[in-house]
UniProtKB/Swiss-Prot annotation:
Family designation: Belongs to the AAA ATPase family.
Record has Ion transport as a keyword: no
Name of the protein this chain belongs to: Mitochondrial sorting homolog
Organism: Caenorhabditis elegans
Coiled coil: none
SUPFAM superfamilies (alphabetical): P-loop containing nucleoside triphosphate hydrolases
SMART domains: AAA
Stated role: Involved in intramitochondrial sorting of proteins.
An example Gene Ontology biological process: extraction of mislocalized protein from mitochondrial outer membrane
Topology, Cytoplasmic side: 26-342
Keywords: ATP-binding, Membrane, Mitochondrion, Mitochondrion outer membrane, Nucleotide-binding, Transmembrane, Transmembrane helix
Residues that coordinate or bind ATP: 124-131
Length: 342
């Protein structure tokens, strides 16, 4: 009996020691891993995104791939319809011909000449719809869309940035067809200099090497960049971005079309002449015009509330509302230019 009790006691102590060791190791891993909290948050976000996008959650991802997968665009931001983009008919037609059609032909044709370009550059002044166009392309082509935040590729631990750069392409490959979108690409892949930090230079080199590798394969992966400073982009990157599209400041006709898109769900008086407003808004971009419309509606709402009315009882917008908003916005822009010159 004594021997039996001793054996039971030993067994209990062994089990207790094993349990304590397991919990200790678990907590040590938790507190010693510098990326533990980031990885846990990434797992939760990826699970939610995959549910929204209908992606198979059984696909295995490494911890670096999970961090990249958090940058899939899902929900309401998954893409834009072509009719949400005003004033870009010629550009939209060219994007359809050079990108959308080749993506559809890729699985049907054996010719590499019918494959889509592996690198696309959208360049032009700020606020002209480059990001919106990129999302519209992804939606029309049925592609997954990774809105790559370059800050997420940087890590203070040696070698981690290169692993994250590799994860960008491995994630894109697992969920292809995929568009990897890099906004302000000039800030990430700008001209390399001898004084660049070693880790940054290595990450750029890794990114370009992987890009070349996928370009020579049959994978449907497209890197799309947007910039308002194309001359600052590294020449080696420009060589890889064979399809380049200028997104210019809209002219008067295009501004009128953009205003129609922005105001299509708003109450406007029949006497409003959007053509005249577009003429008065010379030099304004699409995002500028959206702000002008917001100012016009805000002024109307303020006047309605001041007179004792409700925001839900707004009268249709008048020509004068838009004229005042354009004048106010243009005046602020002019003052900003003067301060910059001073």
């Amino acid at each position: 009996m004594t021997d039996r009790n001793e054996l039971i006691g030993v067994a209990i102590r062994v089990v207790a020691a094993a349990a304590v060791s397991f919990l200790s190791v678990r907590y040590l891993v938790k507190y010693l891993d510098p990326n533990y909290s980031v990885n846990e948050e990434s797992k939760k976000k990826v699970a939610q995104l995959f549910h929204e996008l209908g992606i198979d959650r059984q696909i295995e991802l490494s911890e670096h791939e999970i961090r990249i997968a958090t940058q899939f665009v899902g929900g309401e931001d998954v893409g834009a319809d072509w009719d949400e983009i005003g004033g870009c008919e010629e550009l939209v037609a060219e994007l359809k011909d050079r990108i959308i059609l080749p993506l559809r032909f890729a699985s049907q044709s054996g010719s590499h000449l019918l494959s889509p370009p592996r690198g696309i550059l959208l360049y032009g002044p700020p606020g002209c719809g480059k990001t919106l166009l990129a999302k519209a392309v992804a939606r029309a082509a049925g592609c997954r869309f990774i809105n790559l935040q370059v800050s997420n590729l940087t890590d203070k631990w040696y070698g981690e940035s290169q692993k994250l750069a590799a994860a960008v392409f491995s994630v894109a490959q697992k969920f292809q067809p995929t568009i990897i979108f890099i906004d302000e690409i000039d800030s990430f892949l700008r001209d390399r200099q001898s004084h660049d930090h070693e880790s940054t230079a290595m990450m750029k080199a890794q990114f370009m090497t992987l890009w070349d590798g996928f370009s020579s394969s049959g994978d449907q992966i497209i890197v799309m960049g947007a910039t308002n400073r194309p001359r600052d982009v590294d020449a080696a990157i420009l060589r890889r971005m064979t399809a380049r599209f200028q997104v210019p400041v809209p002219n008067a006709k295009q501004r009128s079309q953009i205003l129609n898109v922005i105001l299509r769900n708003e109450k406007i008086n029949n006497t409003v002449n959007l053509g005249e407003i577009a003429q008065a808004a010379e030099g304004l971009s699409g995002s500028d015009l959206k702000e002008v419309c917001r100012l016009a509606l805000l002024a109307r709402a303020k006047a309605t509330v001041a007179s004792g009315g409700s925001v839900n009882q707004l009268l249709p917008l008048e020509q004068s509302d838009f004229e005042s908003a354009v004048h106010k916005y243009m005046r602020a822009a002019h003052l900003l230019v003067e301060e910059t010159l001073d």
